[in-house]
Each structure stands twice: as C-alpha cells, then as structure tokens.
C-alpha cells in the first residue's frame, strides 16, 4: 500500500500570506500565529515569507490570484475576520471570499489555506485569534505546510 501524507517541515517553501486589514485587531493576531508556525514548525526562513495586505475579506481572492499567477510561491495563506452583523452582508462576504480562494487553489494547482474567521460574535473571533480556542492563523499555516509537502510528494510519484 502506498500512502501519501505530508509533514510540516518545509524549509525551502516560499509562502505568501494575504491579510485583510478589516478587523485588524483580530487579524494581526492571526498573522502573528501564522508567521510563528511557519518559522517554528515549518522552518521557513523570513526571506521566504511575503505578506500582502488588502482592505477586506472580499479582496483576498483577487490578491491571492495575482500571487498565484506569479508562479513564485509554493502556497498561500489567506487571513481575515468576518463577523456576523444584523444584515445579510456577512453571508455574501464570507461566501464569496471562500469561493474565490477555493477557485484560486484549483485554477493554479496551489495550496491556499483558509484562515478567515467567520463568526457570529466578536467574542468567538477573539477566542479563535489566540485565546482559548487557539489561533486559527497558526492552524492555517500548519495546513498549508502539510499540503505543500503532499503536493510535492504527489508530483514526484505521479511523474
């Protein structure tokens, strides 16, 4: 039996982190968690990490697409925070962001890790950005590191 699974060390990986500025008091914690995870667990060097800042979650897919089209990166982490309000705006923003990022991954055959919080309350978002529910930015980085390795292994085995 042949099993393909990735580990999290990816010393030579070039990673772009596309970050929404909206709700920055939360998103900066996600960014810190992602960078810390890339460096500590993935052994990714500073010079191999590029941070791209965009206004909000809706802009994440376009920036991720441009990064992917450059061909210079092994993976992308998208970070943001969309918190439900009293209007349907949340559903549109969260849905389009998710759909757009998935499309980038499939179009460019590149791992795009979804680290965008989509919560009902600000308290839930705070819990997921580094307090009692962990740091979803760090979790997104772990997922990305593993997928970078899985895709590299698949490329070797299938070529």
Curated annotation (Swiss-Prot):
Extract one GO cellular component term from the record. riboflavin synthase complex
Which function does this protein serve? Catalyzes the formation of 6,7-dimethyl-8-ribityllumazine by condensation of 5-amino-6-(D-ribitylamino)uracil with 3,4-dihydroxy-2-butanone 4-phosphate. This is the penultimate step in the biosynthesis of riboflavin.
State where (2S)-2-hydroxy-3-oxobutyl phosphate binds: 86-87, 128
* Gene Ontology MF terms: 6,7-dimethyl-8-ribityllumazine synthase activity
Supply one GO BP term: riboflavin biosynthetic process
- Gene encoding this chain? ribH
Q: Which organism is it from?
A: Shewanella denitrificans (strain OS217 / ATCC BAA-1090 / DSM 15013)
Q: Give the enzyme's EC designation.
A: 2.5.1.78
**Which pathway does the protein contribute to?**
Cofactor biosynthesis; riboflavin biosynthesis; riboflavin from 2-hydroxy-3-oxobutyl phosphate and 5-amino-6-(D-ribitylamino)uracil: step 1/2
Catalytic positions? 89 (proton donor)
Name this protein carries in UniProt: 6,7-dimethyl-8-ribityllumazine synthase
Q: Family per UniProt?
A: Belongs to the DMRL synthase family.
């Amino acid at each position: 039996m042949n099993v393909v699974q990735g580990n999290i060390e990816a010393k030579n990986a070039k990673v772009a982190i596309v970050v929404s500025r909206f709700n920055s008091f939360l998103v900066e914690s996600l960014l810190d968690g992602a960078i810390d995870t890339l460096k500590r667990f993935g052994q990714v060097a500073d010079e191999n990490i590029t941070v791209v800042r965009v206004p909000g979650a809706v802009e994440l897919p376009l920036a991720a697409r441009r990064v992917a089209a450059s061909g210079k990166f092994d993976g992308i982490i998208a970070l943001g925070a969309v918190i439900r309000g009293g209007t349907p705006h949340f559903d549109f923003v969260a849905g389009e962001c998710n759909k757009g990022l998935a499309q980038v991954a499939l179009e460019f055959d590149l791992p795009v890790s979804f680290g965008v919080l989509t919560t009902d309350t600000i308290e839930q978002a705070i819990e997921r950005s580094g307090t009692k529910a962990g740091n979803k930015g760090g979790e997104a980085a772990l997922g990305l590191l593993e997928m970078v390795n899985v895709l590299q292994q698949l490329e070797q085995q299938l070529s």
